């Protein structure tokens, strides 16, 4: 499944990178191994970004700067306060660095890869994320401004960080394979002009990217010899795990569902809101 965050500021992006995205503590099932980010995207290639994510390059892109030279690519919006029509003091957001697109593997897939130790399954997740992001990138658009129609560019820069555990519940971090893909708020038009991304198109592709990820993952798992069945929410699950076992291995999911039941709400959007509101403020961003 793919979830998309609200836009994150440059400060938030850099703080997340230092404390969470690249933090070894986010990987409980690989013995605290440091998270090595990886670049992806046509724009990343144009900027000479390949392989492991460098902290300085990440910071520059989040500020709307060229990752190699520091040259300003996007006119940076400074955070400021103003009084709205209701007489309330509002703090406007600083430059939007981008979005956190999180791809989460189905529970049985996480258990097989992390507890069962089948690294081929982990690689299947990685490849499925890569394909889904490539598909999303095809629809990337530049904001032109004014009344001009957004231009499809098919180019962006993404920094990916893979984690292997969910947000702790009562001190227990359950196995949960997922990838944070930070989509930076910059693209390039056919004329070579740098522009911000059109957010509306990004959110439009969310369900499509989820479908691509699931389809790719199911195909990979079947090629590895696993029997795959459709889960309750349409996700591909590996046969052999009982529903009771999967639920017991997902305390975070139980926490979210309990909040939904309290509020009498359902659906992916409501679940995403519940996930944010039930977070342990002392834990990391997963």
Please name every model-derived segment.
Residues 1-286:
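Intrinsically disordered, flexible peripheral segments
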């Amino acid at each position: 499944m793919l979830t998309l965050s609200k836009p994150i500021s440059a400060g938030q992006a850099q703080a997340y990178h230092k404390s969470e995205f690249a933090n070894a503590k986010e990987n409980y099932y690989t013995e605290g191994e440091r998270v090595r980010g990886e670049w992806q995207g046509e724009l990343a290639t144009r900027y000479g970004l390949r392989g492991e994510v460098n902290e300085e390059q990440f910071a520059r892109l989040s500020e709307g700067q060229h990752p190699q030279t520091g040259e300003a690519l996007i006119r940076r919006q400074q955070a400021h306060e103003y009084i709205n029509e209701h007489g309330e003091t509002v703090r406007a957001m600083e430059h939007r660095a981008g979005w956190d697109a999180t791809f989460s593997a189905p529970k049985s897939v996480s258990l097989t890869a992390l507890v069962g130790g089948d690294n081929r399954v982990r690689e299947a997740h990685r490849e499925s994320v890569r394909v889904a992001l490539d598909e999303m990138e095809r629809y990337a658009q530049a904001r032109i401004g004014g009344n001009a129609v957004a231009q499809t560019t098919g180019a962006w820069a993404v920094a990916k960080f893979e984690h292997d555990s969910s947000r702790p519940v009562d001190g227990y971090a359950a196995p949960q394979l997922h990838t944070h893909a930070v989509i930076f708020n910059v693209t390039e038009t056919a004329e070579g002009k740098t522009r911000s991304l059109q957010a509306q198109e990004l959110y439009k592709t969310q369900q499509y990217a989820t479908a691509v990820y699931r389809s790719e993952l199911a195909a990979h798992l079947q090629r590895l010899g696993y029997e795959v069945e459709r889960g309750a929410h349409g996700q591909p699950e590996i046969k052999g795990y009982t529903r009771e076992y999967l639920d017991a291995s997902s305390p975070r999911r139980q926490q979210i569902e309990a909040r939904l039941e309290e509020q009498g709400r359902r659906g992916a959007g409501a679940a995403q809101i519940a996930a944010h509101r039930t977070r342990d403020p002392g834990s990391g961003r997963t």
